[in-house]
């Protein structure tokens, strides 16, 4: 029997980490990492597994030193902390195993700090490693010959995490994406053929999330709609489960913009209680989209703004991923992004400079052209050297755009254009259910008002900037004059907390004494 500790290192402050918003929500971290509870589920008895998420609790290195195996996972934004943890473990003589997105694309990054490295998916290689370890002959490197059969993936062991410390739950329906964006590592690691879990698997995981008292859940697929026919059948099962159980879960997900071209799919997503979707729009510059092979964003069916508006009209808020620094971008790109996001009524936009991830086609192309900065911490925040502007102009424009987008007036004007002027209806599924169950609807309204009041009170008392506190109060009052809806008010309160995080992040990016860190 092996005593195993699995660690998810602390993230550096990032856009999706919501570190500056979490205290107002009474939480330690935004989402639980998927790898840890899944690896625990893949570990057969009599092995014993302990999960440690450093984002919600400190690592007990004395405890780790007593373990037979300590596994560490992590993404690019966690790589520095991963290295620190591994160095401490090696100093204590611990056998270390490393996996996750970063080591999968940069296998030699940790050198001798890692006894065993897992490249890519590990549903088959983790159990194989444990058998090899028991026999005293673990390999240095493991990589699956074939992609994981998702119909055989077990439900993650959420019971081994302190789920109450997370703001949101997470669930994965599928892996893989059919498209071929040049900068994306997903198709490198997970392939272009979408692979889905069965409806029975997914419903089991949703039930586990409900049992852990999660209410808002991110469907963390990189493209939920990669196989539209299959996901429609899954969504119908999710809708039936929501109806049976009283719509206990609200979802946010990720999808490609061709979602806007499928009215049936949008309707099913809304009925399943998906209220927001993150879309990789990347750029309003069509030449940049062609350059990076983001061809799905150039298909017929209207402009990107028109497609975003169709998704919003269906009943889902759109969050955007935007990238600066493509070869076809000049210094006019910053204003083009600002105008696009305002016209599209997108308040939440993760904007970052183009970065070349190892093993991607972009990385190989830029390396061949001598346009990669190979330093661990590039001076201008990204390893990709732009073509039509200087690196200084790109980094200055990026920081300036972040400051502009998250200036309170600009952010809330975009938000109000959607929720007030646009009157988006993101609560359709629950409202229809509530008409059939009026007592549940009344209790929900009371709960939502109380949650909204609590969050807004914490924001307007604790935010150190007095002008910002006044702005939050003013905007909420204006919303309630127009739409006295507790669900919309709760979303608005959460979006206010998210704004505080993004604004604080933007201000720190602009601080002259801080190193420039690209948005993740």
Predicted regions located by residue number:
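Radical SAM enzyme core and accessory elements
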Residues: 2-6, 48-51, 133, 379-520
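Flexible glycine/acidic-rich beta-alpha junction loops that bind and position SAM and/or redox cofactors
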Residues: 11-17, 106-108, 179, 228-229, ...
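Amphipathic alpha-helical segments that form well-ordered structural scaffolds
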Residues: 38-42, 310, 400
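Acidic/polar loop patches that form or flank catalytic/metal-binding clefts of enzymes
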Residues: 139-142, 250, 319, 347-352, ...
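Structural recognition of alpha->loop->beta junctions
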Residues: 109-128, 268-276, 338-351
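Conserved beta-strand positions
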Residues: 6, 72, 119, 219-221, ...
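Acidic, low-complexity intrinsically disordered segments
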Residues: 2-213
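Radical SAM [4Fe-4S] cluster-binding motif and immediate context
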Residues: 154-319, 324-326, 330-339, 367
